[in-house]
A protein has these predicted regions:
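Condensing-enzyme catalytic core mediating Claisen C-C bond formation in acyl metabolism
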Residues: 1-75, 180-257, 261, 265, ...
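Short coil/turn connectors at secondary-structure junctions
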Residues: 1-2, 102-105, 132-135, 161-166, ...
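Short beta-strand segments
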Residues: 6-8, 110, 140, 165-172, ...
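Conserved beta-ketoacyl condensing-enzyme motif
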Residues: 48-62, 66-130, 141, 274-290
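A contiguous, well-structured pocket-lining segment that forms one wall/lid of small-molecule binding clefts
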Residues: 72, 83, 90, 98, ...
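Short, well-ordered amphipathic alpha-helical segments that serve as non-catalytic structural scaffolds
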Residues: 76-93, 120, 198, 254-269, ...
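Claisen-condensing/thiolase-fold acyl-transfer catalytic domains that form or cleave C-C bonds
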Residues: 112-113, 131-133, 138-159, 256, ...
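Active-site-adjacent elements of ketosynthase-type condensing enzymes
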Residues: 116-122, 168-189, 221-239, 286-295, ...
């Protein structure tokens, strides 16, 4: 089975305490949103303490055009991608020796917070010594599900090409999409929740033998689920001044009524019950989302501790977030024969599930 050999994450330079983010939001929306003080409680109740951003807080005190925001997205997404790829291919926590970019057969680039044609992966190829025959697979529009979907597509590629080495790179700069003149509740909730980040994994096919320092998660199976007529649950409303967040409060209820039965079915098809999972690697979409996972899949709160800790330290970074969670399992938790389920939700409305088993 294809294995995840190495992983890395990249933290943007500007760290903001949640209390300071609340004060900035209060300043920007003062006398513009009715009952603002009541809505600002989401900053205190979301289980987030710090978040990291690609721009300083004062950047949001002035208006920026869609063109300016997107230009900055292209510049920084390229920069962060280069950094996180280099870190993944040289990660001494997992690899005995570095792997050259020239050895990579495909790159799956995942993002939803900016637009670039050619896609960011092409720009990265001009900065690192990849082969000019590298297969590029950009994925756009999957939002928070993008990290798990990238793992799934790397699995598909490596099943078809067992000698392949594939990078999955996720970069999201959610702060560049913040709209200071959008006074909707969705925008306010987004301001309390979303952050910036980047992550990269290296997935290798069955015929690639790399001696690693730790046991590695093999990908046993993947699954996808889509909900018809659900475009309004989560996504972007694209307007002249940029991307406006769509974010419905029904997501935890959807986990209970729609996702839970699918996950049980997916696991049963692999001969596993949810109680048999050693690790639950959930995208922490929010505190209520994690609680819905626990209730629906009959998990103890201990099973979501790492996801909750990533949410506390980083907020919701969209697609890279579930890989931040996976990194902690790969560094500190995974032992040979452990079984894990990686799950994320995103626009569509959709879910991605990946079943993992740690191997020597």
């Amino acid at each position: 089975m294809p294995k995840i050999i190495s992983i890395s994450t990249h933290q943007p330079p500007y760290t903001l305490q949640q209390s300071n983010a609340e004060e900035l939001t209060k300043e920007l929306f003062y006398e513009k949103i009715p009952k603002l003080e009541r809505y600002l409680k989401v900053f205190d109740n979301g289980g987030i303490e710090t978040r990291h951003f690609c721009v300083p807080p004062e950047w949001h005190r002035t208006n920026h055009s869609f063109e300016e925001r997107n230009g900055l997205y292209i510049e920084l997404a390229t920069q962060y991608s280069v950094s996180v790829i280099q870190a993944c291919l040289q990660n001494e926590s997992f690899l005995h020796s570095p792997i050259s970019p020239k050895e990579i057969d495909a790159i799956i680039f995942v993002s939803s917070t900016g637009i670039s044609t050619p896609s960011i992966d092409a720009r990265v190829m001009n900065k690192l010594p990849f082969s000019n025959q590298l297969k590029r697979i950009p994925l756009w529009g999957l939002g928070c599900a993008g990290g798990a979907a990238g793992v799934s597509r790397a699995y598909d590629f490596c099943k078809a090409h067992p000698k392949a080495k594939v990078l999955v790179v996720c970069v999201e700069l959610c702060s560049l999409t913040f709209q200071p003149n959008d006074f909707s509740k969705s925008n306010l909730i987004g301001a309390s929740l979303f952050a910036d980040g980047a992550a990269c994994i290296l997935v290798c096919g069955d015929e690639i033998i790399i001696d690693t320092k730790k046991s590695s998660p093999a990908i046993l199976a993947t699954g996808s689920k889509w909900m018809p007529d659900s475009e309004n649950v989560m996504g972007w409303d694209v307007k002249n001044n940029g991307l406006h967040v769509i974010f419905q409060k029904s997501i935890p209820a959807i986990i209970t009524s729609w996702l839970g039965p699918y996950i049980e079915q997916f696991l049963l098809e692999q001969g596993i019950y949810s109680e048999q999972l050693t690790h639950f690697i959930a995208h922490p979409g929010g505190k209520k989302v994690l609680k819905a996972y626990e209730d629906t899949l009959y998990l103890s709160s201990q099973k979501t501790d790492i996801s909750r800790e990533i949410l506390r330290q980083h907020g919701n970074m969209s697609s890279p977030t579930v890989l931040y969670v996976l990194e902690q399992f790969m560094l500190h938790e995974g032992q040979v024969e452990d079984t894990g389920l990686l799950v994320a939700l995103g626009p569509g409305f959709c879910a991605e599930a990946v079943l993992l088993n740690w191997r020597a």
